[in-house]
């Protein structure tokens, strides 16, 4: 478990309990406790009812991410990012159709039409099949991104087993939560801020 991976996970979550942090990092509580305690004692994390990153933690994380970016092939990451943007548009449309009937200007989906819901959810397998090779390509430069394939697969399995909350529910590693965090990672790997990405037409 690295300093970078812990700080990045906490930043992406905003606020997270140690138990939930362990889950998202693919470890157990005992496994992450030493590094969490170290980062808290050094002032990089703030421990209260939940963990959050401190201003000095953000500065340290930016340094670590910049060091990480300095060793990557930027062309490979740029290609992965562009490929992701295309799949992201389709995933956003899927989520919109799950939440609203009739598109962005439609009405909230009451989920009382099993055939409609099944047709929307059926599109998730295609989205997943398209995003996994993109993650694989990005992970040749940033191996820690491999974890996103595993987390998306777990969420996909739960959705396909009928636990549809795992498509979009916040505060758990739902498909949408993990997707959002992967998007943030790719934006960061490009050396962009979210605002800069949005100006280029890449909105979440």
Protein language model features and the residues they cover:
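C-terminal regulatory/effector modules of DNA-binding transcriptional regulators
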Residues: 154-204
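Exposed, interaction-prone assembly regions rather than primary DNA-binding/catalytic cores
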Residues: 75-164
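A short, conserved structural fragment
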Residues: 40-50
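Minor-groove-contacting beta-hairpin "wing" of winged helix-turn-helix DNA-binding domains
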Residues: 49-59
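Short amphipathic alpha-helical interface segments
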Residues: 1-27
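Short, amphipathic alpha-helical interaction segments positioned at domain boundaries
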Residues: 58-86
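Short amphipathic alpha-helical interaction segments
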Residues: 25-41
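Intrinsically disordered, low-complexity terminal tails/loops enriched in metal-binding residues
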Residues: 15-17, 75, 79, 100, ...
